[in-house]
């Protein structure tokens, strides 16, 4: 099984250096014909590029479902030194300072950017270029990146976890909306109810949402945001408040991650730095910390989620 291969640990970019050849960096919109090159670039750091890699694998480089545009930055020898998705959200892998500056300039031209998400040091550097005059942040969320590379021990009893069906949509939507509001301060059911429901529906149709339903209640939910041979990235993990501390969460997540590790090398999640009990919950299942991530929410009431 792939899950039995050696654990891979990516080293964070601790210093972003200028281009070795002092020729102007060139940034262009990426097209379908660039897809193989871009995926090769992103999979050099698969853990940190899970979101962008997943979107490209699911939708291609050019798709409305990406909710933005992919750009590539090249050095004087025409080699990729950075890839970014800029639109509703900003996601970046910049291997040099020039690329980071180029992406910040581009992002300034998108007035409806809602969030910026990435490794803590990269986000800090990007922000200096993006907001040189000290623009305020609507909200900053710091999270711990956790990674699981070995299947959790099998519990004594398993949960009836299953893929969600379309008839579960009415249960999934309000729960997911509540989680989004708690993190961003934006209620997606107020600012973009149709689009939000469509995205929840699409995840179900693509077999990416897992649920446990008992007594007509949604007990557990998790969404597969990105699925690749290197890493599966999960979001939207929650347990109904009335069923917490009853092992529902650990049983469901253990069952889900064992299944996922049958076709991927690792599973990753982001957990709010302030939620220590949640971090301990994941660590008890075998997740280990791989660094800090920052998400800067740029707009609140007028944001499109």
Label every PLM stretch briefly:
Residues 121-139, 250, 273-291:
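Conserved active-site alpha-helix within GNAT-family acetyltransferase domains
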Residues 117-123, 269-280, 296-304:
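Conserved beta-strand-loop-alpha-helix junction that forms the acyl-donor binding cleft
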Residues 4-52, 151-189, 305:
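Short amphipathic alpha-helix that is part of the acyltransferase structural core
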Residues 97-106, 239-241, 245-261, 279-280, ...:
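Conserved acetyl-CoA-binding loop-helix of GNAT-fold acetyltransferases
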Residues 21-30, 40-49, 53-111, 115, ...:
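Conserved donor-binding loop and adjoining core beta-sheet/short helix segment
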Residues 111-119, 231, 260-271:
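Conserved GNAT acetyl-CoA-binding A-motif
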